């Protein structure tokens, strides 16, 4: 299942955008779930907050990383490697993005 990775509050680095990052992550989670994306069963609330993801910490615009599946799960690995599954992931991600812009 999917989850969102977003930066933690780090004074001098993320403090200017962390609330917007969190809003983006929550909108992505809600939109993807509403579109039928299976949720992660190992990340509570599908939201992981991290201090050590440089690409998230240095951004000055809202940013989030979406992990769409677990390659160690055979069913998810098959979905990720098939064209039909990749279209599903694209649809779910698009639903999350649309939800973010609709909620702004």
Residue positions per predicted region:
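Active-site-proximal helix/loop segments of hydrolytic enzymes
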Residues: 1-104
